[in-house]
Amino acid sequence: RLAPNGVRVTLLEPRQSPGAGVAYSTAEPTHRINVPAARMQLAGDEEGAFDHWYRHQPAFTVDVQALRPDGSVYPQRGQFGRYVAQRFADAAASSGGRLRHLRDRALAFHQGTVTTDGGLQLKADLLVLAISHPPPSLPAQAEAWRHHPALIANPWQPGALDAIAPHARVAVMGTGLTMADTVATLDRLGHRGSIVAFSRHGLLSRGNLSGAGATWPGDYQQGSLR
């Protein structure tokens, strides 16, 4: 949008859809954005652009849980990934070939040349690192458990939680939004065993009062190991 004529931009992204990253690539229906859609848009978009786009998608019609009593919408998180991919496709289509997406991974940059995992050598005057968050990985202290059959290092991996027995006891390292994703997915899968989430600070993500959901029927307790 702001680049002068003659500038060519090549995006190296191994995923099929650019712009979704780890968080917005999820296809899990219980994973939702944690702010109203009206507060999410790309730089340069009009305020509420994503909200307007989503309300005109078939997904909005079939997802009855997206619309809250106050009129705001909280789409499944993958919908924002689709929105970003659509905006990228629109920009690429109108760029006259100046913007392209290569499904490849950059390995090195040396003397103005990017080397990719697929063996390409790309000349570049400028290199922009926009790598976002990497997938979850084990902390160094847990490296000895890497191959333990009960350990799930990346709960966002498709199907990662499917093999957990309905009444198995589950421990989650961390009490942030990834923990919330994990609990929501387990609930959808019918898990009814105990879940213990622990972290150094023990704080939960802030709740949202715009919904009219029923009171959680489970036994929730907060404690400390100190």
Predicted regions and their residues:
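Rossmann-like dinucleotide-binding core of oxidoreductases
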Residues: R1-A3, V7-P18, V128-R226
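Glycine-rich active-site loop/strand segments that organize a redox cofactor
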Residues: L12-R82, F198-R226
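A structural signal for well-ordered alpha-helical segments within the folded catalytic domains
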Residues: G78, R82-Q86, L177-A180
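Helical element adjacent to the flavin cofactor pocket in flavoenzyme catalytic cores
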Residues: G81-R100
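A conserved short coil-to-beta-strand element within the FAD-binding core of flavoproteins
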Residues: G97-T113
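Conserved beta-strand-loop-beta-strand element in the redox core of flavoprotein oxidoreductases
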Residues: A108-Q121, P149
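Core beta-strand elements of the Rossmann-like FAD/NAD(P) dinucleotide-binding domain
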Residues: D117-L126, A165-P166
